[in-house]
Amino acid sequence: MSTDVVFDPKRVDKKHNNGLNLPDSLIKRWWSSDVTAVNNSYKNNNVNYNREYPLPDIFRSDPRKYKDVFPLQSHWIMQRYVTKVNEGIYKFLNYFDMKSSTFAPGFNKKEKTNYIHRIAKDLAAKANKEEIRNYSRDLINTLINMDGYDKLSPYLNFLIAILSDFINKTPLTIPTDKEWSRPGFNRIMNPGLVKMQNTYDCIKVFAWAHNYEEPKILFDYLGNRVACLTIIAKDPSASTAAENVFISSEIYSVDRYIWAAAPFNTKSSADWLTNTMYGDLTEEITYRFSPCFGGHCISAEEILTRKKVIDLYVNGEYKTIITGEGHPFGTVFDSMGMLRDPTFNGPLKDLPFTFKSIVDGFLHYGLKQKVTGIMVNMPKDDKWDIDRIRDVLLWMFEITTYRDKTITNFFVDQYVDRDDICCVPFQVAIGSNFSEDRKDNNSLVRQPYFMDPKFIKKYETGREDGTTRYNLKFKIEEDDEEDNILSINQEKITVDFSFFYNKLMDGGFMNKMDLCEIIFRTYAKKSPHVYGYFLLRGKAIKTRSDMINLFNGELRFENNSDDIIIGKKIYENGVDQLAEIFKEYNLNTSENMAGRFKQDPERRYITVNKFVKGDRSDSGGGPPPPPPPDEEEYEDIADEEITITPDVTEPVIANERAAITVVQSDIPEIPIEELITEEEEEEEPTPPPPVQTVATVDQPMVEIVPGQNLVPVGESPMSAPDIDLPIPGLPGPQPQIMEVTSGGPIIEEIESPPILPIQPPLPLPAPPTPQEPPKSILQPPKLIVEPKEVVVPTPPVIEQPKTPEEVPKQIVPPSPAVVSPPSPTTIPQEPPTQPSPIPSQPPVNIIPTQVPPRPGIGERPYPFFEPITPDTPAITPPKLVIKKPADEVIVEEPEEEEKPFVIIDEDEKMGEVEVGQGFPEPFSDRLTVDDLPLEDPRFKSEDVDDIMVAIDSQLEELGEGVGGDGDGGAFIIDPTLPPEVFIDIVDKTINVIEKRVATKRKISDDEEAESESARTRTWVRTTPKDFSGLTAATRGPRINITPKKKRKIVVTTEEEEKLLKEPVTESVEDLPSYEEVKLLDESDNEDDELDITSTPEDMETLKQSRAAPIRARRRGVVMDEESPIKPGSQPVDTSDATKISTDTDELTQQE
């Protein structure tokens, strides 16, 4: 396929002014699609991609069948992308209607896919300023000249995202404070999101959901390939986009997505944070709470009727996860991100219907109980019955009342099944949030605690395939106060219903079912009859039996025929007729509830201040209510204690319903004055008697394969009997939580293996053992955590090791540590043919939380211990002067103290050599530039590295509207920028790109390599097997070696950039000749001079004195430069010195 498929102005038909000759009908047809059209896409020919591009069978079948073929930890999405044509790109290109356009007629599906690849490759392959400018201008002009450019402008962003996708292969890192506050960064790149993307090694695509259409473009382009998608809402209209994004997600089968709503109205959001419910907690909420990456509303039905609870091993810690597979139809509710993000203009105040009420009230109350997030979903249809509503209430009561260890993060994971109710399952992590004893912790990422295990009972059912299903229950014991689920820190918590009356709806409700009212009002948009029906249905709760029956789905109306009549009329006539219906039955309303419901977009809920006919038993708003007409009717609820204790030893029965417990408590209620806003303080509400509420709900089980990825349960999880299973915190294998002031608890599973190591575990020190330490190639130098930073009794300190077999000093290890099998993403894994010395003992890993900056980079932190990949900047090496006479290389090193460094062999990079197994095969299982299907002689992968680094180095100068990921290449452009601004941004980046590309192009020429190597300080790396284990970078005296061939890698760190800019005072011609250098070696270092034919005794001395330090550096271990390993400190078998290998694994085995 020729290269002229790319945008070529010469091929544009002159008689068409839209560049690609897009038919107007296509644009109008597509962009006029509304929610109904997308929602009914299976019936709508305009957007029926499901018919045109059917989903592969792998997504329609049981994903468990593919867990060995496409394991999650092996990036099965990437493997599928490499091996199959991506249907999402077809959808993306379908907008251009390639088959019918004169621009590129006759495209088949593969050619459409290659089209996008070529865009990225061509842009990355441009070698100079003019080429990039011209290409960019042509590309932009082609787009802006299309009809309906205002609709198609997102394509510009997607092209940039595509470029970033292909050229940026490094995982994201946690932003620094500098990056965090940089214009364009806007805190939307929060650490939680970054951590999650590192978890899955995701393709990083950032887009903006301004309107309804952009999400469709995004999903059409990305399709099933995207592993982690972030959609950033930049303005209030995004609520509509959000609704449709998730409808689209069902159609387009995105595997995982994240919703991050963050309009950029910083002042109004700051005012909201200050003036509403948080007050003096604003600073903690804004800066100390971990920003959440989080989701659309989890379906309450899925949360509770199909709830799955597992222990997920993420980032070196266990997290209790509730998995709910929700069906998102409507407004997005990111409770964590909205409440904590200073750029967000209030919690959902711009979103339709009463999610604002949920946030303003529920989360405020929940904050008092250390609740930081709630996710509730609205139903897509009108089929929700009282059982489902009860489940929603139980879940809400559960997180607001029962837990001191509450929701802090939202995880997205799980396989998707296109035929499932929704293909975007969610997981909600249960952990702790801000607490008094952690106020001084400035860590951006807060580590969660366990939910108190005494509240959990797990059950196990063995499966034929060896997997296990778990069921979680809450224990409610009537007489055991200490073990009662109501107990939080051994203190009773009062469920203050008056808070909801006064806080949530500006005037209260007619009864204690106000919470039901909140839930139903969220459904009023699509289900007005359900709203009105239950609005009145809740009025019938007057007795103990009513409360029980309501939550058992058996509410009786107690001879109140008006309730049934009114409810029936509302059901028949809808909410629009509420005013007339209420007037007919003498029901007074506040502010004409029907009119207010229809007219005020921010307050589309009905406030019933008083029922003239009937009772107003517990309304909290306005003046104090008159006494109820019949006080005896309410006495039993105040006098009785209702406790329903399910028998946890009984097998779970399908559709079994738990009950709600109402307790009259003597504990003083939470002062209402602390909970209401300044506006509502004028009302001076009168709270009703506090009621304590406890709920329990049966939860289905989840199928877990320890150490493997999570798979959904195929059949009904309710069918199997429950068997007691010990869990962390209970007798048996127990987690141990240790407080670390800089990063949260570190948990160790003592006996049982970790479950679901999705997040690649990170290197962590272990006590000195003969076993091989974890292999991490890159480490910050002398990263030592002082004992004062670790809050453990008498933390052990590792002495400086004397031998290579001892674990080098790195971090003071806390005694309990997380044990996790390594993941191919971050930790190099050995092939089966070369097992580690102790294969049964996997490496120990930990998350470093506060680390010194990387040398030569400046203020950028080094948050993760990442393996060096060909596009990861290496630590600044010592200066070298390299002379190449004939085939020999002489390496000269300065006398000053050198810093650790790593050299990467390109053979090892490509996974082509047998030796060097200490290095990972970085991209064997994920997308790289080399995996692109088309060959282009102009495109070179090293140019991509230069562009990536150059873009990153220029981000701070690019100005408003541009952001990056801090690691190069994640090029985020504000879509509102005009094309000329983008071109200017490109121009600002050209200088560095041009310099780097030109430099490397010159260096790559063999005839110029000798003269250019000294100027650019090019590393020369030889194949290890060619010179018996000695590297050119071996520390110590200069060594004469004769490599078979050389590999050149240019170190692209900022320090190296500075070196490139320094004037070169010494040319190659000025250097001493080879003979002179050799003579100098012999005269200055006669005792140390060694060559490749040295005796075994000399080899022993060399190996102990120099091979060990470089071996440690290649492992990423920080050596104490002031205490070098002394020769002879460890006996080494040198019976066959000629077979010594630099490979760390082989050498360790020989020793």
Curated annotation (Swiss-Prot):
Protein name: Uncharacterized protein ORF78
Pro residues: compositionally biased ranges: 754-773, 811-842
Composition skew (Polar residues), residue ranges: 1131-1142
Record region (Disordered): 611-633, 709-740, 753-778, 795-880, 1060-1151
Source species of the chain: Ostreid herpesvirus 1 (isolate France) (OsHV-1)
Acidic residues bias: start-end ranges: 1082-1091
Domain of life: Viruses
Comp. bias (Low complexity): 867-878
